Amino acid sequence: MRYLPLTDADRSAMLSVVGAGSVDELFADVPAEARLSAPIAGLPNHASEMAVERHMARLSANNVTAGSVPFFLGAGAYRHHVPATVDHMIQRGEFLTAYTPYQPEIAQGTLQVLFEFQTQVARLFGTDVANASLYDGSTACWEAIAMAGRITKRGKALLSGGLHPHYVETARTMARFTGDVLDTSAPVLTAAPDDDALVARIDGETSCVVVQYPDILGRIPDLAKIAAAAQAQGALLITVVTEPVALGVLQSPGSLGADIVVGEGQSLGVGLQFGGPYLGLFGCREKYLRQIPGRLCGETVDADGKRGFVLTLSTREQHIRREKATSNICTNSGLCALAFSIHLTLLGGSGLADMARLSHLAARKTAAALAQVSGIEVVNSHFFNEFTVALPHDARQIVRDLADRHVLGGVSLGRLYPQEAALANGMVVAATECTTDEDIAALVAALKEVLA
């Protein structure tokens, strides 16, 4: 919607309609102390465009961009190469919106893109269907928990200790209002996740088991075992994928028995961009189709028998009675979904596998190099492109010391789990196809200096 300025005559006409003699009279109900009567003290006057550009450039020079230093951060947001073609394509006027294509007769291009996106997500996840996107991975995770509750008529969700703590906190926030019980635990610094302990906590009141794949420490759980145990108790397995590139080499969660698969699509096409906006991915078995949150784009034929695309299901509160809605999602992450779809299309199946192999190789090189540093232990026995190291003392300070040496060395578990003293020395390290041998050498050298 374009900004249309108002003239004094426009304002007078509007005030006349509502029966107010002036703008001050219109806002008379607002306490005087809450109204702005003069310029804000200390706020500078306007400046020229060139002066503002220079000022903003000076401020931005204080930032450290992901590509300017050795970068090993991950834990749910990853630095991958995004081809320039992606940004070029999403800036086309036909696509540059996140808004819902309510009128199929004038939105066939957008609807077809969403249909193709759904197909790609379903194939990636190994599920029968996928929706047209959600806001991000954490909200998609909660939507899956809520969906499992509707399906099973149960109110207790079992969350694996390997689930990202921010996803857990998002679920806790929502559960405060829904009354759902969340059975949670913190991860333990072990080479592999304790799947047997998780399975032992499943009972007849469990609606779903939520497992991250790979988990927050980079470990790879046995989804088939957990799926069998959950389904034997009448519960659903929800698998959370925060790094979809991993599915270029790992078996898809759906093929391993997951009932619902959700994830964060940031790795493909979206970029880090200061933490958002990101992209929620959601897929499930076809028999749960009518419980899926958000929107589903489908293929049909028009009155002339020509192929067309429409919003087949939109069981959200704007479309149906609130008490019957499966979700209150509003406009979805359509533009981010387009970027994801373009990037994945450019890669193709073999390209995604190559990207995954390069990321895995970079992580293996990094882990091998760090294992040679005195005082550092690589915790994981198996991993994709992310692993955890145990450091000789508090990892938060070590991360800060590395940053002072212009190396972004990892995410400290003390930051993610500030109440868990047993995790304070842990640091999660990620590598991708962007990681070079020089980056690895710089990390090793900086760590040796910090730990000396």
Curated annotation (Swiss-Prot):
GO terms for molecular function: glycine dehydrogenase (decarboxylating) activity. It catalyses: N(6)-[(R)-lipoyl]-L-lysyl-[glycine-cleavage complex H protein] + glycine + H(+) = N(6)-[(R)-S(8)-aminomethyldihydrolipoyl]-L-lysyl-[glycine-cleavage complex H protein] + CO2. GO terms for biological process: glycine decarboxylation via glycine cleavage system; nucleoside metabolic process. The keyword Oxidoreductase applies. SUPFAM superfamilies: PLP-dependent transferases (SSF53383). It is an enzyme of class 1 (oxidoreductase). The keyword Oxidoreductase applies. It comes from the Bacteria. InterPro entries: GcvPA, GDC-P_N, PyrdxlP-dep_Trfase, PyrdxlP-dep_Trfase_major, PyrdxlP-dep_Trfase_small. Signal peptide: none annotated. Its EC number is 1.4.4.2. The glycine cleavage system is composed of four proteins: P, T, L and H. In this organism, the P 'protein' is a heterodimer of two subunits. The glycine cleavage system catalyzes the degradation of glycine. The P protein binds the alpha-amino group of glycine through its pyridoxal phosphate cofactor; CO(2) is released and the remaining methylamine moiety is then transferred to the lipoamide cofactor of the H protein. This is Probable glycine dehydrogenase (decarboxylating) subunit 1. It comes from Novosphingobium aromaticivorans (strain ATCC 700278 / DSM 12444 / CCUG 56034 / CIP 105152 / NBRC 16084 / F199). The gene is gcvPA.
